[in-house]
């Protein structure tokens, strides 16, 4: 797992939490929850790849891991669209920077998850 990605997740989550305090927006809380869930999934998939014979363990533990993988890609696409929408409507430069970094992070994580999943197949 790339330490830069981990610190990027932490930075984005901290920034979004600060934005949430200054906003009454409930959908931002949902985005934060989705980011946290995505980070945990990415980390667990990365750990499975690190152990490399762990495919059978992963399949035994979760027989529907391919379905779950598809759902995670749908979540990523949803988050990308939400972040793009937020980026279009916000005029606050702090929020714009945060959403641009979040968007970049989502693209990186999507690529990492694709790479991990191809290694497991």
Swiss-Prot record:
Q: Where in the cell is it found?
A: Virion; Host nucleus
Give the GO biological process terms. Answer: exit of virus from host cell nucleus through nuclear pore
| Cellular component terms per the entry's GO annotation | host cell nucleus; virion component
Q: What InterPro entries has UniProt attached to this entry? A: Flu_NS2
Q: What else is known?
A: Average number present in a viral particle is estimated to be 130-200 molecules.
Subunit info here reads: Interacts with protein M1. May interact with host nucleoporin RAB/HRB and exportin XPO1/CRM1.
* Sequence similarity: Belongs to the influenza viruses NEP family.
Listed name of the protein: Nuclear export protein
Origin species = Influenza A virus (strain A/Chile/1/1983 H1N1)
């Amino acid at each position: 797992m790339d330490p830069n990605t981990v610190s990027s997740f932490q930075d984005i989550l901290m920034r979004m939490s600060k934005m949430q305090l200054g906003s009454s927006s409930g959908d931002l809380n949902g985005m934060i929850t989705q980011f946290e869930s995505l980070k945990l999934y990415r980390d667990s998939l990365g750990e499975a790849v690190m152990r490399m014979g762990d495919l059978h363990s992963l399949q035994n533990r979760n027989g529907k891991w391919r379905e779950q993988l598809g759902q995670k890609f749908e979540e990523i696409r949803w988050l990308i669209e939400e972040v793009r929408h937020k980026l279009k409507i916000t005029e606050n430069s702090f929020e714009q920077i945060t959403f641009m970094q979040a968007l970049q992070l989502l693209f990186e994580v999507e690529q990492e998850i694709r790479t991990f999943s191809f290694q497991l197949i």
